[in-house]
Amino acid sequence: MVKLAKAGKNQGDPKKMAPPPKEVEEDSEDEEMSEDEEDDSSGEEVVIPQKKGKKAAATSAKKVVVSPTKKVAVATPAKKAAVTPGKKAAATPAKKTVTPAKAVATPGKKGATPGKALVATPGKKGAAIPAKGAKNGKNAKKEDSDEEEEDDSEEDDEDDEDEDEDEDEIEPAVMKAAAAAPASEDEDDEDDEDDEDEDDDDEEDDSEEEAMETTPAKGKKAAKVVPVKAKNVAEDEDEEEDDEDEDDDDDEDDEDEDDDDEDEEEEEEEEEPVKEAPGKRKKEMAKQKAAPEAKKQKVEGTEPTTAFNLFVGNLNFNKSAPELKTGISDVFAKNDLAVVDVRIGMTRKFGYVDFESAEDLEKALELTGLKVFGNEIKLEKPKGKDSKKERDARTLLAKNLPYKVTQDELKEVFEDAAEIRLVSKDGKSKGIAYIEFKTEADAEKTFEEKQGTEIDGRSISLYYTGEKGQNQDYRGGKNSTWSGESKTLVLSNLSYSATEETLQEVFEKATFIKVPQNQNGKSKGYAFIEFASFEDAKEALNSCNKREIEGRAIRLELQGPRGSPNARSQPSKTLFVKGLSEDTTEETLKESFDGSVRARIVTDRETGSSKGFGFVDFNSEEDAKAAKEAMEDGEIDGNKVTLDWAKPKGEGGFGGRGGGRGGFGGRGGGRGGRGGFGGRGRGGFGGRGGFRGGRGGGGDHKPQGKKTKFE
C-alpha cells in the first residue's frame, strides 16, 4: 500500500485550500499542529496527525489516501480502514473529497484524521468528475446534489453498510475526483523509512505529475487532465487491486463520449487518445457510406472534341499523362497528321486521339510500327456500344485448326483479316480461332473461298458469328435448313485412343472432325465427321462404315437435325438396346437378335461394369426392322429391354423421352420389369413382377451407370 500514495505528492499548496467549515474548527488546534509539521517536513505535503500520536495519524491518513486514489467508492481501501480502531471514520472524509467546500475537511466524529481533503477547493468540482463531467455541467451538478444528500446520511459513523452503498452510487465521480485532487492524495508512510522510499519514487515521477500541480478550474481544461492522472493511478495499483470496477467505469465513460459533440472529443484526443466505442465506428462508417466518393473517370478530360477518334493502346504507363499527350502528338505530327486533342486513360495504358477529318483518321489507321516512349502503340477505331453486332457480322469462326498453328500462319491463309484471335485454355490451343475482317463483304467473300482449306493436313471449317451463326446449320457451313440430306456423319464405337488426326487420314474429304473428350482429356468413344456436301457424306458412309480403326469396327450414320422429334423414328441398320442386365454379355446380346452381325455393350471405362445399354448391328435396315418387331417388349437375362433405332445426341440422349421413363432402366428406372429369375423368355422363374421387384423396381441393386450424352 506504500506505493499507492506517491501519485500526487508534489501537487498542491496548503495556502490554496478552502477555509474549513464549522466542523473543522472544533479541532483547529490539531490542524494547526499538522500544518506546522507539514511546513517543516516538506513544503508540499499536508499531514494532519491524529490525537493519539504522530505515527498513528500518519497510518490512518495513509489508509485514507488509498481510497481516493483508487476511485474511493470501489469499496476496497476504504473498507480496509474500518478494520483497525480509530480508522473506521476515516472512510467518511475520504469519500467526501468530491463534495464542495462544505465537506472539504469534515473529520470523523471519533477523532480520526480528515483524510487530507483540505486541499479540495470549489474549483475541484470540474476536476472531480470523469471526462463527461468536464464536457457537460449538468452531470456535475447532479452528482453534487447527490453528494450533499449523502453528507447528511453519513453523520452516523457506525452505519458502514449505508456508506458503502452511497459510495457505489457516485463511484464514477469519485474516481476522477481523487485523481484530480492535488495534494490531498499524498501522506507520510507508517514509518520514517517508508517516507524516504516515497521521496525517491516521487523524484522519478515529478515529470509525470507536473501537469497536475495546479488546481483545475471548472470547464473543459480539467477534463484534459483527468485521463492522464487516472491512467497513472490505475497503473500503480494493478499489482494489488482488482480492476473489475475500473473496467466498468471505463465502459461507462466510452458510452458517454459517444453522446458528446465531435469537437469536444477531438480536444480530449489531443491530450490522451481514448479507445473508440464500437458504436462510434459504425456511425463513422455509415457517414462514409452516405457520402461515397465520386467514381473515377476512366479517361481524363471531357467528351471527344470531334467525331473522328482513334484508340491508342499499349502506352508506357510509367510516364505522366502530359508526357504521353506530348509524345503522341509529336508522333502523328511527324506523319503530317494534325491532332486536335489527346485524352489519356486513368491507368495511362491507353488513350484516344481526336482528328480534324475522316481522311486524317484513315491515314492514322494505316500507320504501323509507331513507338511512343519505347512502346509500340496499338491503333484502332474505338469500340462503341453498338459495335458488337457489326463486329459479329464481319467475324468468322474457324474450327478444326491444327493445335500448333500460329497467328502468322493463319495470316498467310486469311490475307484480308484485320485481326486473328486464337482460342486457348490453360495455355493450350483449342483448335479454333476468330477471324475479324474490316468489312462484312470481306468476311462473306472469305467464307465462300476459304471453306475447307487445308492447313497442315487438316481441312478447316468456317462459321459465322452472331445472328448469322444462329441461322446457320449446326456444323453445316452455309445457312440452310434440314432437308433430309445431312452433311455430317456420327461415328460410334470409336477406340478411346483414336484422335482427330487418325480420323482425318480415313476421311480425307472431311471438312470438320470433332472427337468429344471427357474431363481427363480422353475420347468418349464417338465422333462427328462433317463434309462439304451431302454427296461426300453419303460416299463416306457407304465406304467406311464398319471399317476397323485401331482395332475397333466403327459405325457410321447420318446425323439428323438437332432437336427433331422424329429423328429417332428413322430406321437404320443398328438398334439401340437399353435395360440390359449387369450380367448380360455381348455374345448373349447378339444371340438374342436373329440376323444380327455384331453387338456391343457400353461399359464404364474405370470399373469395366456394364452401363445397362448397348448396340446391335445388322446387314440391312430390313433385318433390323424384323429383329426389332420380334423382340419388342422382350426380355434378356430376366430384364425387360427397350429397343429403338440407334441415334446419337438427340433431344434427350439415350435416356428416352427427355431422359424420363427411367433413363436406361426401363419404365420408372432401375432393373425391374416383368422378367423372371433367368433365361431369355417371358415369365421365367419369378413370373410377372419377377424376382427383383416388379415394374419400375430397382430392387436392392445399384443403378446401372450414367447417362451418356453426345455432343
From Swiss-Prot:
Task: Provide ranges: composition bias, Gly residues.
Answer: 651-697
Q: Where is this cross-link: Glycyl lysine isopeptide (Lys-Gly) (interchain with G-Cter in SUMO1)?
A: 298, 325, 590
Q: Which residues form the RRM domain?
A: 308-384, 394-467, 487-561, 573-648
Residue positions of the PTM Phosphothreonine?
Answer: 69, 76, 84, 92, 99, 106, 113, 121, 215, 302, 368, 406
**Residues bearing PTM Omega-N-methylarginine:** 695
- What modifications does the entry list under PTM / processing? Some glutamate residues are glycylated by TTLL8. This modification occurs exclusively on glutamate residues and results in a glycine chain on the gamma-carboxyl group. Symmetrically methylated by PRMT5.
Cysteine pairs forming cystine bridges in this chain are: none
What InterPro entries does the entry give?
Answer: Nucleolin_RRM1 (IPR034230), Nucleolin_RRM2 (IPR034233), Nucleolin_RRM3 (IPR034234), Nucleolin_RRM4 (IPR034235), Nucleotide-bd_a/b_plait_sf (IPR012677), RBD_domain_sf (IPR035979), RRM_dom (IPR000504), RRM_dom_euk (IPR003954)
**Chain spans, region 8 X 8 AA tandem repeats of X-T-P-X-K-K-X-X:** 58-135
Compositional bias, Low complexity, is annotated for 56-107, 122-137
Gene Ontology terms for molecular function: RNA binding; telomeric DNA binding
List all Basic and acidic residues biased stretches: 274-301, 698-711
The record, for SUPFAM superfamilies, names:
RNA-binding domain, RBD
List the subcellular locations.
Answer: Nucleus, Nucleolus; Cytoplasm
Pfam families from the UniProt entry? RRM_1 (PF00076)
Query: Which Gene3D superfamilies does this entry report, sorted A to Z?
Result: 3.30.70.330
Q: What is this protein called?
A: Nucleolin
Organism source for this protein?
Answer: Macaca fascicularis
Taxonomic lineage per UniProt? Eukaryota, Metazoa, Chordata, Craniata, Vertebrata
The encoding gene is NCL
